[in-house]
């Protein structure tokens, strides 16, 4: 210890002589006197000279960036109560106080280290000072601890010490760094490296001491202790737990060994380097403390830096003050420029493999007990923080995050599962200062999202229920409407879809009756049907949905628009009306392409006075045309002609009538006849299982032309037609006759027939009566039909013999066995 004091005098005086202020009465003692003082200090167990060294460097000139107020304070610097008579003791304890007083000192010019090796050589002969390299600092701390039982002079005058900020010199900074190094090894070449490693630490202390100089006492501790303490992760600020303060007691072992787990938590690569290179450990620690200070979120951690220069101060005293520093306000000044700090220390070797995932997971698991954010708040990638070149501008970003340290600890364990995928995707992206808050907010937002999902499910269920209810109501309403429409269709004999033909306006109030529509003057009425109505009335519908007949004189009608509407919907019926009498001409014309525009008078709507009479005459046709497309108009015409032919009285004409039916089925296979419902009443099974190709043309086809004239005169005999239909039904039921009724040939009853008693299935015949043979039942009887349309069996013996030609024509007729 005394070596540094004796050896550093020339340099110290040289450094202080260039300053405008110098301590009065301070002269460099001789080497013998220094040794004597050293022995006195060790033998008497004098208290640490940390505070007593304040008058040594109290008058040094502040650096270029020092405040001008420092020049006014040198007169307060000497502290006689704490000075030891010897010269070595003040020098030995100068470093901690000078560092704590001078936060503005710039150590960038700390280069006069040449006298230090000579001092080391002198100390080789002192066995009292020399200790094993592994325990030098530890023993030194123990010696300092033995000196501390007395009153601690450091915190006694806190105000004067805070005012003596410019009292730190370059040589003092150098001595504070070299003393622990000299005790570890006697090699000289290591001094420049320690000097460079110390510069950033001193600059950090300069920027940090300003925040704590007002309320925090002088810090005491070895630089190695601070390095070991701060060697923790450069990306993760070290834990500030009361346990750490307890470890800093005077009886604690070497600080580097105690705080080694902190380094392994922050950076596995640095911990490996610490184990492999014990020679360079102090350089690494000096560099890592500066990185740790830059990356810390709480500026209260920075006041620990002055303890690095207090070689003779116990570690426990510096830790006792740590609790007071944590509550300090953030620092207000950035670090000095790089030109003042000097060149950075050499960069240590990088570990071969660096994997921070397990540390991130461990940090996320322990984040509940930490008040700091998990990783670096400066958002630096992993490699750059190890390089000191990027260190000076970084402290400027610290004041931008002052509120973060004041936040209470947050319990962010629930979102651990959410953080792992983020770490997996962003391995090189460190967690930012607001990462914890964002994750918590994300968790809250996700919780809200889940609540929204639950509520949305409930809303969906409600919507589904409402939708079901609405659909059920719609179905009920639809069923009611359909039921009502069916009743209306049945009541008013409506066929096909209901179409609005015309819109009319009521010209007077009408009070309807049973089937009549009631409406008021000016009300709009939709005309649904203008045919198949009672004379002078149309079928209308009001806006309320009521149906009924209206008088044509009670509404205002635009006949021009009605004609155009009628022509667009149905242009064929008027031509049929004109050619009603010429049935076959009409059919032939319909057989043509059926179009030609239907222009001219044939497509014009008839005048109102004759509308009722004309449409009543052809109401069956209009019904069909209103509900059937124009494609079926040809079939309509054919059915109309067939119906007229069915009204003949003559049985021979009836047989001729069957041929057009067959030809119609041949020409229009697959097409449905709209008016067939009127014909099916005659015999629904007429067209069942019938193929026109199975039967040869009837021999009576030649007489078709002869029946045309009579068909016209007999077409208006509905009673005869109904009777014929009834007889055909009896035939099918009584004789189990299937298929089309076809006449095989005609014959007459023998004139020699005598009246006899007929059976239930026998046809009552008269002598000379003409009969139509429908079926050859067997060799004794045949199925015949008389002129009245009745059917029955007739014995062949009662019929006139036609020379056996009859049997040739019927071929396989015997297959019909109706017995």
From Swiss-Prot:
The modification Phosphoserine is found at residues 28, 46, 222, 318, 445, 561, 568. The keyword Metal-binding does not apply. Keywords: Acetylation, Cell junction, Coiled coil, Cytoplasm, Nucleus, Phosphoprotein, Repeat, SH3 domain. InterPro entries: FYB1/2-like, FYB_hSH3, hSH3, SH3-like_dom_sf, SH3_domain. A motif (SH2-binding) lies at residues 584-587, 615-618. Residues 150-160, 342-351, 380-412 have a biased composition (Pro residues). Disulfide bonds: none annotated. Pfam families: hSH3 (PF14603), SH3_2 (PF07653). The modification Phosphotyrosine is found at residues 559, 687. The modification N6-acetyllysine is found at residue 3. Residues 499-560, 736-804 form the SH3 domain. Residues 1-490, 589-635, 649-728 are annotated as: Disordered. GO terms for molecular function: lipid binding. Residues 448-495 form a coiled coil. It comes from the Eukaryota. It is found in: Cytoplasm; Nucleus; Cell junction. The keyword Coiled coil applies. Disruption phenotype: Slight defects in platelet function. Part of a complex consisting of SKAP2, FYB1 and PTPNS1. Part of a complex consisting of SKAP2, FYB1 and PIRB. Part of a complex consisting of SKAP1, FYB1 and CLNK. Interacts with CLNK (via its SH2 domain); this interaction allows SKAP1 and FYB1 to recruit FYN to the complex, thus promoting the phosphorylation of CLNK by FYN. Interacts with FYN. Interacts with LCP2. Interacts with SKAP1. Interacts with SKAP2. Interacts with FASLG. Interacts with EVL. Interacts with TMEM47. Interacts with LCK. This is FYN-binding protein 1.
